[in-house]
């Protein structure tokens, strides 16, 4: 291995300009790839398509347009007035169906408001259109032209047979005969007709809109805009930004206040914050590491060279992201501080040893080669074990974690290769004309020299009092190990969004006005879903969900799923039955009438009758059957609007749905597949803890085996690995102590700490063996020499790495803050254990091996 390093570094130092030229060319290509990076912030991107909740979501998107909605909250003095209804009508027309709506057709699939049912009636739509024309006409002549056009329309002729419409139509004809002078009268008549239509509409279907899309007092209303599922998220967010500007300006100019929210706007806010945080965190990490490097080497050019290694490796990572189509996510925000912290350590170790060799009055080329050959094995082991740590992410089922591990793996590999090629080449170009006059700057640093001596004393103190140190360590291990039982999990991407953001506050306000706004659906698939048995089973499923014991409070109230927030075919047929009963009795069908229908008397007697009743429902309620039933009748949706709750609530909702679906599906009438945020989050939560165990265990095993093979000693391999084992347990203990959950970010800490933290243990073990077996020092002297020679480099690497992660604590995202703080503390503890605890293990191992050799037994050394 030393020969390989010698050849690579030797060639780099002999042809430094060629090496730098090749690296510059590769970097230019990487920049081209980096420009192709796209961003992705969505909950479903967390899981692979093979998961049931995601596979079902894709089917719902294909058949029904998906579950992604932008929401507009409107507030005003009276949103049920004709004037406010007109503004809402004009807005819906602007987005879908009217002049200028083509601008939004690639984004908007469907627009729903409290007016939607009314506007599906041709006569009502024609009346609203006439009202809009009269209010926006530029002259009396233009207004009367609109009136005359309406009077000869098919909709006006269909109103002729309605006695209550006769006075209205007669008044319009008189106004039309008066010409421009009749414009005012026409507008008055139309406004009165719209007011009457709204009143009758709310009386007939009030239970379907009041409290759901408009408050009973008319002070607030919500517009649900279904977003097309086939657009890339980057395009969705771009167009959503334009829609937000248009919406706010549209309503503000008409005297209404509008706020936008929904998942699309939360993800948009997440993207904006992530870009801002990436820049801020990267700059702060850069200045912090530059300061640490300056205190270590006290040379501006040294700072530039070590940072150049990291910057080039980062550019190569982003180039791979662009060419491989890997999207930038919230997890990507940790890439820059992470690589700054890890890759800089390799350069620090090489540069520190370079000055050590220069202090021996060697030339630049010889010093560069010697520095890599001597410290190269330790740096290689550090890089290889870190790579194994990130390689363990490949077994995760969660795509973002796999991709993050792949990128970090590449970054570590690039950082190592550049440290033994680019850095030596640059050092030779800088120093070869200086001969052998260079001195080792680290030795001249009094503070660092004091630190070296202090660390050596602390290590020797621990070595001389092994038993108390080991007992204390054992107590800590047991305490932290037991704490794993109390760790919670979190997988909701919406918790990434700071609660003071406008989109989050607006979403909360919408829920305060109208209840739950998250849509969770059951996709029912069967041969004949309109048959009476299927409809009864469908209703049985809805009842099983609504009346599930875990959906009920001790007082009998429903916690998550409510009948008034449930949309299904049985619900439509029940409402239609109530309407028919009310009409027969000569009364208005209030919302309570739906509940008064006898069980089962709402069920159509045949599929043919069901189809007829659905057509009638479309006329009576403005109900759009394709929103709940596919044209072939083989797939239907049951949609529940549920509140935004914590992960425990999401898990409970998922359990209720699965339990009810399991009971009904067992009959074989149809299959029930479930999706929506509770199901997606539940699937993700199930994987977080197993991901931690599987990836962490694999990383620890691979790293331990590699160190054992390279050291050719199980004892030394386990000793070097012990520091990360302790750091992982400390991580678990800290999570439990602080009360932080295991989430999409913190789940990666174990493997990361294993991969990056084992570097400290490797460098100490490698240098100890060098002092013990090559320099022939005794165990205590070897500990002293080891800590004094590598202590500064390890502390510098630990400060830069831990500091880079600690900088994440100022992020806007709480999961990223938790990730940064816990990782920083775990890595710092790994460094401390390597310098203080590991020497006690090393001297014990060395003493026992020496006794075996003296006794004539076979040692395990080289």
State the predicted function of each range.
Residues 1-24, 369, 417-477, 773, ...:
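Interfacial helix-loop-helix hairpins and adjacent transmembrane helices
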Residues 19-54, 64, 74, 395, ...:
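Transmembrane helices with small-residue packing motifs
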Residues 55, 103-300, 311, 553-704, ...:
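Extracytoplasmic
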Residues 292, 321, 380-423, 704-708, ...:
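Hydrophobic, glycine/alanine-rich multi-pass transmembrane helices and their short helix-loop junctions
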Residues 317-436, 809-811, 826:
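Hydrophobic alpha-helical segments
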């Amino acid at each position: 291995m030393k020969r390989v390093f010698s050849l690579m570094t030797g060639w780099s130092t002999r042809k430094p300009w060629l090496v730098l030229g090749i690296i510059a060319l590769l970097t230019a290509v990487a920049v081209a790839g980096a420009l192709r990076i796209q961003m992705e912030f969505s909950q479903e991107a967390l899981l692979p398509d093979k998961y049931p909740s995601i596979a079902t979501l894709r089917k719902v998107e294909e058949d029904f347009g998906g579950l992604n909605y932008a929401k507009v909250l409107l507030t005003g003095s009276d949103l049920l007035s004709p004037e406010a209804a007109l503004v809402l009508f004009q807005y819906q027309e602007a987005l879908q169906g009217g002049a200028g709506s083509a601008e939004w057709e690639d984004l908007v699939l469907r627009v729903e408001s409290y007016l939607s049912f009314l506007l599906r009636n041709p006569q009502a739509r024609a009346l609203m259109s006439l009202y809009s024309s009269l209010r926006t006409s530029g002259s009396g002549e233009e207004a009367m032209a609109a009136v005359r056009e309406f009077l000869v329309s098919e909709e006006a002729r269909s109103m002729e047979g309605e006695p209550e419409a006769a006075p209205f139509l007669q008044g319009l004809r008189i106004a039309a005969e008066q010409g421009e002078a009749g414009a005012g009268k026409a507008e008055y008549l139309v406004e009165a007709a719209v007011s009457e239509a709204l009143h009758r509409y709310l009386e007939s279907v009030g239970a379907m809109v009041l409290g759901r899309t408009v408050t009973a007092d008319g002070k607030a209303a919500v517009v649900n805009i279904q977003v097309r599922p086939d657009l890339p998220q980057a395009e969705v967010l771009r167009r959503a930004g334009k829609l937000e500007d248009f919406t706010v300006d549209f309503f503000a100019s008409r005297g209404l206040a509008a706020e936008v929210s929904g998942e699309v706007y939360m993800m948009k806010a997440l993207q904006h914050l992530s870009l801002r945080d990436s820049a801020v965190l990267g700059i702060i990490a850069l200045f912090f590491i530059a300061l640490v490097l300056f205190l270590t080497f006290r040379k501006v050019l040294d700072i530039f060279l070590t940072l150049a290694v990291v910057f080039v490796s980062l550019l190569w990572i982003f180039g791979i992201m662009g060419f491989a189509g890997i999207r930038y996510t919230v997890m990507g925000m940790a890439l820059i501080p992470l690589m700054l912290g890890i890759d800089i350590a390799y350069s620090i170790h090489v540069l520190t040893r370079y000055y050590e060799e220069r202090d021996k009055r060697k030339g630049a080329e010889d010093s560069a080669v010697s520095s890599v050959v001597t410290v190269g094995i330790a740096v290689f082991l550090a890089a290889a074990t870190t790579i194994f740590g990130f390689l363990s992410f490949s077994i995760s089922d969660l795509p973002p974690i796999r991709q993050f591990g792949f990128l970090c793996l590449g970054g570590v590999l690039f950082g190592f290769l550049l440290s033994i090629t680019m850095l030596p080449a640059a050092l030779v170009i800088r120093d070869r004309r200086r001969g052998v006059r260079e001195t080792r700057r680290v030795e001249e640093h009094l503070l660092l020299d004091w630190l070296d001596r202090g660390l050596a004393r602390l290590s020797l103190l621990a070595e001389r009092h092994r038993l108390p140190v080991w007992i204390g360590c054992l107590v800590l291990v047991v305490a932290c190990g037991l704490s794993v039982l109390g760790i919670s999990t979190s997988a909701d991407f919406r918790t990434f969004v700071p609660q003071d953001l406008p989109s989050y506050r607006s979403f909360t306000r919408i829920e305060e006005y109208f209840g739950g706004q998250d849509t969770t659906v059951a996709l029912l698939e069967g041969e004949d879903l309109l048959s009476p048995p299927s409809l009864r089973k469908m209703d049985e499923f809805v009842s099983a969900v609504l009346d599930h014991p875990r959906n009920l409070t001790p007082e009998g109230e429903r916690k998550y799923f409510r009948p008034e927030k449930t949309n299904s075919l049985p619900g439509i047929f029940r409402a239609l039955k109530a309407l028919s009963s009310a009409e027969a009795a000569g009364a208005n069908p209030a919302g309570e009438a739906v509940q008064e229908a006898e069980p089962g008397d709402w069920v159509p007697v045949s599929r043919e009758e069901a189809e007829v009743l659905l057509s009638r429902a479309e006329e009576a309620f403005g109900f759009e059957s394709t929103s709940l039933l596919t044209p072939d009748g083989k797939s239907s949706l049951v949609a529940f609007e549920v509140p935004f709750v914590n992960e425990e609530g999401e898990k409970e909702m998922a359990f209720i749905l699965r339990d009810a679906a399991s009971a009904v599906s067992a009959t074989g009438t149809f299959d029930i597949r479930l999706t929506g945020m509770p199901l997606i989050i539940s699937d993700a939560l199930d994987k977080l803890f197993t991901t931690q165990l599987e990836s962490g265990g694999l990383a620890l095993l691979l790293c331990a085996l590699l160190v054992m093979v390279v050291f050719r000693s199980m004892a030394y391999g386990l000793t070097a690995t012990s520091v990360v084992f302790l750091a992982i347990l400390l991580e678990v203990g800290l999570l439990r102590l602080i009360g932080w959950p295991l989430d999409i970010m913190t789940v990666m800490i174990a493997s990361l700490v294993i991969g990056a933290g084992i570097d400290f243990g490797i460098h100490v073990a490698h240098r100890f063996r060098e002092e013990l077996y090559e320099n022939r020092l005794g165990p205590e002297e070897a500990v002293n020499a080891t800590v004094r020679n590598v202590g500064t480099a390890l502390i510098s690497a630990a400060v830069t790495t831990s500091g880079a992660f600690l900088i994440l604590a100022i992020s806007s995202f709480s999961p990223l803050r938790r990730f940064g703080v816990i990782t920083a503390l775990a890595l710092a503890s790994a460094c401390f254990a390597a310098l203080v605890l590991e020497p006690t293990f090393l001297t014990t191992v060395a003493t026992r091996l020496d006794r075996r050799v003296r006794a004539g037994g076979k040692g395990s050394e080289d």
